[in-house]
Curated annotation (Swiss-Prot):
SUPFAM superfamilies named among the record's database cross-references: S-adenosyl-L-methionine-dependent methyltransferases
One MF term in the entry's GO annotations: DNA (cytosine-5-)-methyltransferase activity
Enzyme Commission number(s): 2.1.1.37
Protein's name in the database: Type II methyltransferase M1.HgaI
Family annotation (Pfam families): DNA_methylase
InterPro entries the UniProt entry points to: C5-Methyltransferase, C5_DNA_meth_AS, C5_MeTfrase, SAM-dependent_MTases_sf
Species, as recorded: Avibacterium volantium (Pasteurella volantium)
Length: 357
């Protein structure tokens, strides 16, 4: 009978990524998150986990997390250091800018924790550019891969990969850099790829709802949009952008055409995984976040709205009965979903620890 591994979660947010860890045999004992509203939600979802709220750069916070982890013999660490400094949606798109962005140095506190705690298994995840990140170490620009190899190469096997959540059971295209460290003498292989799950398979059985309407299902209601936005999207076919419409085209109040990218005001497709869900999934003008819709008898399309919270949950791989309080602000839920690594990806990666050892 396998023995459960005790775990630590750094930069946990509300803990979406770790949601299924208990199913594979990893029990998160302690977590750390800076932003209070995310940490408070984490504590409500995981009432038995110890949440340390505060900045990990604060030595008192760092030591508190470390001491709890040591006391509980933590042997697994998962860390998702903030990615805004590396995100392609951000401004820092070249190595030199990233090296001067203080947010990108938060990974050094993960490294410091590993050196103190020495867990058997470590999973660090972030946007794909993480693997190209270079930081100033002793006044020298050094790739993150070299930093980790120099610090831990003698004790750990270190693996660098870019994985797409859609290849591991999540109905969403979401590529993440995955760094795995496992102590020498242990094995940690990648999981086998799985069958692709489409948007239709994930949310196709949910009732159709229009903007401002409620289905009666928890978290499945149509977010409110302007009459003009609804009109544009009603005339936009599945998989298309309103910017491709000949008549019902996004316009300003004075009638002038809005300038924008074809990824905006765009319906997603039914027959493939959803595009990457972004933090602005509440805005119908944002990237590829409008319901696919279905053709109606009058020639328009249904569901002229952004995806509902329930649809976002399913497309992230979360269950309908995800334990979030009823009074959780919708925008907070949308933000943490837009930032998270899908939990089925983490589950599949970590299950290999137990399959091999």
């Amino acid at each position: 009978m396998k023995k459960n591994i005790m775990g630590l979660s750094l930069f946990s947010s509300a803990g979406i990524g770790e949601y299924f860890l208990s199913r594979v045999g990893i029990d998160i004992i302690v977590a750390n998150e800076l932003i209070k509203k995310r940490a408070d939600l984490y504590q409500k979802i995981y009432p038995n986990h110890k949440m340390v709220i505060g900045d990990i750069r604060d030595q008192r916070i760092f030591n508190k997390v470390l001491n709890i982890a040591l006391t509980n013999q933590v042997d697994f660490l998962i860390a998702s250091p903030p990615c805004q400094g590396m995100s392609v949606a951000g401004k820092n798109r070249d190595v030199s800018n990233m090296a001067n962005d203080n947010r990108n140095y938060l990974i050094m506190y993960v490294i410091a924790m590993i050196k103190k705690l020495k867990p058997a298994y470590i999973l660090i995840e972030n946007v794909p550019f993480l693997l190209k990140l270079e930081l100033y170490i002793d006044n020298k620009l050094t790739p993150i891969k070299n930093i980790l190899e120099d610090e831990f190469g003698s004790e750990y096997h270190i693996h660098f990969d870019i994985l797409d959540a859609a290849d591991y059971g999540t109905p969403q295209r979401r590529k993440r850099a995955i760094i795995r460290l496992n102590k020498k003498g242990t094995i940690w292989n990648l999981p086998l790829k799985q069958n692709i799950v489409s948007v239709e398979q994930a949310i196709g059985n949910l009732p159709s709802i229009e903007s401002g309407k409620h289905s009666g299902l928890k978290w499945h209601y149509g977010r409110g949009h302007t009459e003009q936005q609804i009109e544009w999207m009603k005339h936009t076919p599945t998989g298309k952008s309103a910017f491709e419409n000949l008549v019902h085209y996004p316009r300003k109040a004075n009638g002038e055409k809005v300038k924008g990218y074809h990824s905006s005001y765009r319906r997603i497709r039914w027959d493939e995984p959803a595009p990457t869900i972004t933090i602005r999934n509440d805005a119908i003008s944002s990237q590829r976040n409008v319901h696919p819709g279905r053709p109606l008898l009058d020639g328009t399309y249904s569901d002229a709205r952004v995806l509902s919270v329930l649809e976002l949950m399913r497309l992230t791989g979360l269950p309908d009965n995800w334990e979030i309080p009823d009074d959780t602000p919708e925008i907070l839920i949308r933000q943490i979903i837009g930032e998270c690594i899908p939990p089925l990806l983490i589950e599949n990666i970590t299950r290999e620890i137990f399959n091999e050892n």
